[in-house]
Amino acid sequence: MKKLFLGLTAALLTSAAAANTLIPDVSPASSGQHVVINITQQRLFLYDNGKLSKIYPVAVGKAMTQTTLGEHKIGAKAYNPVWHIPKSIQKERNDGVKSVPAGPNNPLGPVFVRLGDPKLSLGIHGTNAPASVPGVRSHGCVRMKSPDALEFAKTIATGAPASVIYQMASLNEDANQNLWLAAYRDPYNKKNLDTATLKKSIAAWAKAHGKTIPAARVDAILKGRTGAANCLTCAKGVKLKSPLKSLAWTSGTDAYSKPKVMPKPAPAKDVVLPQGTEIEVDATDDTNKAASEPKQSVRPTPVKPAKPAAKPATTPAETPASAPKAASEPATAPASAPVKEIPASSEPEDLLF
């Protein structure tokens, strides 16, 4: 009963997140699935045949251990993974623990989905500290709340494209034809928000719709960077109404963002690693436990990702395996690798990757 309650709570929070989240200016694949992760929003957007199907809150890499931007592919999946602690972290912890079995103390949660080339040591996974999602506090991986991670893993196909972007603003038109603007903090200090182009897009839209949008209002939102969705054309108290359309503001026009025409992808075959596969997280340069970036004021579902990397030679490679057991059945660690359980009272920041 408790698990059912927690699952329903997570679902409601995720729905709330989607209801208040503006979408980025992207051109998702017109055919098949496409994952888009906007670092500044701490959100994962899942598109299906060019249409938005789901929004998840996520935690992303800190400034010292940034999540790698660019184009990636979704790789193999590992249910009930064993976390193999990297030597750099073993040295930092200095407690003799080399791995953590599947279960409530495992920072990878019930599932790990490879993101990009295994050499990047990136993944999308669950967490043992759900309150850390959304946020900017992982060692590079994309962390989700465990119920969200399981849902995502069962939905996404191996081989699907995944884009990790860094857009510091969103400009959307809602179902009532109101224009909404959100501006986000700059956790990686990239300072890449082109305000001139953004304002050009706002002006073009306002002219086309016969609206007047005060420049001071736009400037205040861009300066505040609260992450909240602000209506530029409606009275205070009006709610955002879906479906939303993103303006192609990065081009400075009032046109809508459109899917990128792509050939229909070949049927994908999911790659599922054996239960209890060891996943190693590389965090060699992340020894600074500085305070994490403040979360955006609009926070939907708290989700928590981590940063793992498939174990080189010993891992059974990224090859298909038999269907995974229920995620609730934790895998036991290999008998050859003595495992010392980490108490739940341990400082979570040490375990979240």
Stretch-by-stretch model annotation:
Residues 159-162:
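Loop/turn positions that initiate beta-strands
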Residues 7-15:
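Bacterial N-terminal signal peptides
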Residues 1-4:
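Positively charged n-region of N-terminal signal peptides that target proteins for export
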Residues 170-177:
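Short, Lys/Arg- and Gly-enriched loop/turn segments at beta-strand edges
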Residues 138-155:
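Short beta-strand-centered segments at strand-helix junctions
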Residues 247-353:
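Compositionally biased, proline/threonine/alanine/serine-rich low-complexity intrinsically disordered stretches
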Residues 20-132, 151-155, 179-276, 304:
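Gly/Pro-biased beta-strand-loop elements
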